[in-house]
Structures are given as C-alpha cells and as structure tokens.
Amino acid sequence: MGQKINPLGFRLGTTQSHHSLWFAQPKKYCEGLEEDKKIRDCIKNYVQKNIRISSGMEGIARIEIQKRIDLIQVIIYMGFPKLLIEDKPRRVEELQMNVQKELNCVNRKLNIAITRISTPYGHPNILAEFIAGQLKNRVSFRKAMKKAIELTEQANTKGIQVQIAGRIDGKEIARVEWIREGRVPLQTIEAKIDYCSYTVRTIYGVLGIKIWIFVDEE
C-alpha cells in the first residue's frame, strides 16, 4: 500500500513555513503546544458562534501564533474578514478578552490581528467549509465538488484535487470519491501545495473531505 504523508509536514522548511513560532524548554514544550491549541479552538469557537447566523462560513484560512517572553501575537488570516470587522473594535476586543480568559495569561500581553486574503477560494480550509455547507444542504457531492473546482480556477491555481469519503448520499456502504483538475505533484518537494482535511457531520453520518491545491512551483 502507498504510504501517504501529510503534504504540509513533508514540505516544512522548503516551501512551507511553521504556523507557530516560539521556543520552549523541552519540559515546558507540551504546555506551549496546549496553549496554541486553546488559542486556535477559542478563536474558531468564537467565530462559529457569531458568524454562523449570517453566512454559515467561518472563512479562516489559518491562524499564526508568535510568542515572546511578554507578548503573544496572533494573526488570523481570513477570507471574509468583514464578518469580524463589521463593528471591528468591539468584536476583536471581545475575542481578545475570551482568549485571555481561556489562557489565564497574567504577565503577558495578547495581541490579535486580522489579515485579509485576496483569493479566499484559493485556500483549502475555506473551500472545505464551502463543500461542507453544500453537503449539509443535501446538494449532490459531484455538484459540490465541481462548484468548488470552478471557484478555485478563478483564484489562478495550477491544480486541485478534492476527495470525499464516507456514506456519500446516505448509501449503506461507505466509499471514497475524488476528482482532480490540473496538476497536483505530491511527490515534488519544490511544488508548493496547500492541504487540509475537514470533517463534516451530515444527517447521514460523518464525511471526511480532503483538499490538495497546487499553488505554484518555487
């Protein structure tokens, strides 16, 4: 059987950079890791609670965390930042308070910045959310995949592969369906590939969505 490695971890240090930048003593490392998870979960939960009502899309491509001794800098890359910025100071302050409460950071300052992405549908996380929304609304999976590929083509990517696994359309037997458009060279380390796996809960059960996007060659 083919051994499938995560395309992001495979390219770390060449075309892929780390999403968390900090140093820690070996004994304290797990605490830092746990802190990162808390920050990411807290932000996602806040965005989910406040935004689901209006559009059903979170639009978070990635969350980068940089830590210094007295400062935690969090950068949220969003495809549709107006969701958080409509009444900007209040929303961001509220989010900051939530994260601070969760972390209980006494002697460290927390700073949250929001960066807009020019082509939201060129990012697999946002695309996976779009497909998940379609599947929840009982749109046929093939239609959802094709629509996602059309959206990606507008974002000037060189190739995309979408895979959906599980009880598709409520069938008794789980199966894997996939579709590819353009080139997706997973073996080439120089090829910048963006990847995400996303779980969606539908009325039929849990489906797994995986998306590979070939951005461009270094």
Swiss-Prot record:
Q: Where in the cell is it found?
A: Plastid, Chloroplast
Q: Which domain of life is it from?
A: Eukaryota
Looking up CDD domains in the UniProt record yields: KH-II_30S_S3
The answer to whether the entry has keyword Protease is no
This entry's Gene Ontology molecular function terms read: rRNA binding; structural constituent of ribosome
GO BP? translation
Plastid in keyword set: yes
Outline the extent of the KH type-2 domain. Answer: 47-118
InterPro entries found in the cross-reference section: KH_dom-like_a/b, KH_dom_type_2, KH_sf_prok-type, Ribosomal_S3_C_sf, Ribosomal_uS3_bac-typ, Ribosomal_uS3_C, Ribosomal_uS3_CS
Which key words are in the record? Answer: Chloroplast, Plastid, Ribonucleoprotein, Ribosomal protein, RNA-binding, rRNA-binding
Q: What cellular component terms from Gene Ontology apply here?
A: chloroplast; cytosolic small ribosomal subunit
Gene3D superfamilies with a match to the protein in the record: 3.30.300.20, Ribosomal protein S3, C-terminal domain
Major location, coarse class? Answer: plastid
A single Pfam family it belongs to is Ribosomal_S3_C
Complex formation = Part of the 30S ribosomal subunit.
Q: Which PANTHER family match?
A: 30S/40S RIBOSOMAL PROTEIN S3, SMALL RIBOSOMAL SUBUNIT PROTEIN US3C
Similarity-based family: Belongs to the universal ribosomal protein uS3 family.
Please give the name of this protein. Answer: Small ribosomal subunit protein uS3c
The scientific name of the source species is Aethionema cordifolium (Lebanon stonecress)
Tell me the gene name. Answer: rps3
